[in-house]
Amino acid sequence: MQYWLMKSEPDVWSIDQQIKAGEKGADWDGVRNYQAANNLKKMQKGDLCFFYHSNIGKEIVGIVEVIKTAFIDPTDKEKRFVAVKVRFKSKLQNPVTLENIKKTKALENLSLIKQSRLSVMPIDTKSWKIILKMGKIN
């Protein structure tokens, strides 16, 4: 299993909308950056992803699970980019802010800090566990 972080602007797609999508999940589409799209292509069924609210809040608010691997993004008319399907797993009891991540020495090499414009990025196991603890998830 691999771990990831996926960013969404909450006024476009929020964790609450993801929850409402239920067990059938929802397409994670609209990614138009090649590096982020390549990360989507690497995702496997069962991988877990932090759900990050960008622009408004700038915080990790929940976890989603990949339930369908990469397929042609239905919102891409040129059919160059991919989407995955994810379903809600849990909300963090304590959202983990970008500010708190930046203050945590053990997380200083996260792509979230180093490549702040990247919308889909891998998270190493050690960082995943640290963020879970910060978010009060066992």
What label would you give each PLM region?
Residues 11-13, 93, 128-130:
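Short, acidic Gly/Pro/Ser/Thr-rich loop/turn segments
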